[in-house]
């Protein structure tokens, strides 16, 4: 995102606990997003804030930190009259919406993590509707590509093939699963943030509309890496067993519904507009 913003401005401030420069001209600002004063100082002088933070993939951490962080950012943007772009995921959609997700899909999350995402989304929409915040939501499907080290495609397929191991896929490799390419997500987020009439709306970031299955992803990666497309399925039983030893895998259990069925992310609204 910092690279893409270079197409629109030469003044980018990177805010994190330990920020690292991406562009030579980047300004670095150390802050804790759960600290109100830190956020107020970080936002000061900005035209647009891009909220792209990720907390540890842990329900208790999300419940504790996300509402505080969102409120701090909303308050800072209102105080400094700054626009806000919130980079979001699909966890708040209903289970029934997953086979064909659009910006108008019903919000009824079937998981505890999804409930946290619904809370912070509603906080943002309330601030837009009741307090005059100028903001938008840029929503992504599961990622692949540069920087997506924790994605299913990276951990389950690419990393294992590099190590000479079998790949794994979660639940069912015959189901469709949309994936957003990280450079496309960055490009789309930067473009939305710099498009005045995009504000006040939810946008799905540009994502390939090819309906590829897990098996097809595995075959594509195997062909590119010149290895055999060997894989196994990480089913509910295996997740439960591995979850006894791995917190990260344990946290995947409640998200299984996204892999038990087709998962198609429709980004045609973005593609028609841009």
Pin down the residues of each PLM region.
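Mid/C-terminal beta-alpha module of Rossmann-like enzyme folds, strongest
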Residues: 1, 188-252, 267, 272
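N-terminal Rossmann NAD(P)H-binding glycine-rich loop of SDR-like oxidoreductase domains
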Residues: 1-8
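Conserved Rossmann-fold NAD(P)-dependent oxidoreductase catalytic core, especially the SDR/UDP-sugar
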Residues: 13, 71-118, 136
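NAD(P)H-binding glycine-rich loop region in Rossmannoid oxidoreductase-like domains
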Residues: 17-80
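Short-chain dehydrogenase/reductase
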Residues: 63-67, 99, 110-122, 151-155, ...
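Conserved beta-loop-beta element that borders a ligand/cofactor-binding pocket
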Residues: 89, 122-147
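Substrate-positioning beta->alpha
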Residues: 149-156, 170-193, 200-204
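Alpha-helical membrane-targeting segments
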Residues: 156-178, 229-263
């Amino acid at each position: 995102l910092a690279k893409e913003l270079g197409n629109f401005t030469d003044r980018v401030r990177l805010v994190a606990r330990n920020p690292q420069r991406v562009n030579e001209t980047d300004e670095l600002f150390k802050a804790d997003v759960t600290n109100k004063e830190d956020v107020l100082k970080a936002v000061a002088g900005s035209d647009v804030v891009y909220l792209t933070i990720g907390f540890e993939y842990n329900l208790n951490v999300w419940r504790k930190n996300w509402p505080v962080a969102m409120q701090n950012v909303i308050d800072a943007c209102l105080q400094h009259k700054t626009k806000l772009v919130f980079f979001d995921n699909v966890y708040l959609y209903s289970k029934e919406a997953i086979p064909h997700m659009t910006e108008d899909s019903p919000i009824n999350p079937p998981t505890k993590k999804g409930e946290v995402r619904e809370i912070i989304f509603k906080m943002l929409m309330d601030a837009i509707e009741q307090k005059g915040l100028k903001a938008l939501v840029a929503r992504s499907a599961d990622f692949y590509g540069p920087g997506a080290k924790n994605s299913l495609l990276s951990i389950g397929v690419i990393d294992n093939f590099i190590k000479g191991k079998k790949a794994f896929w979660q639940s069912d490799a015959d189901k469709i699963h949309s994936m957003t390419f990280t450079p496309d997500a960055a490009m789309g987020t930067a473009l939305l943030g710099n498009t005045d009439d995009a504000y006040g709306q939810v946008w799905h970031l540009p994502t390939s509309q090819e309906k590829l299955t897990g098996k097809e992803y595995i075959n594509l990666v195997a062909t590119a890496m010149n290895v055999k497309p060997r894989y196994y399925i990480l089913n509910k039983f295996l997740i439960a067993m591995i979850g006894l030893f791995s917190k990260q895998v344990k946290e995947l259990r409640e998200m299984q519904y996204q892999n038990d069925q087709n998962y198609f992310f429709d980004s045609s609204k973005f593609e028609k507009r841009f």
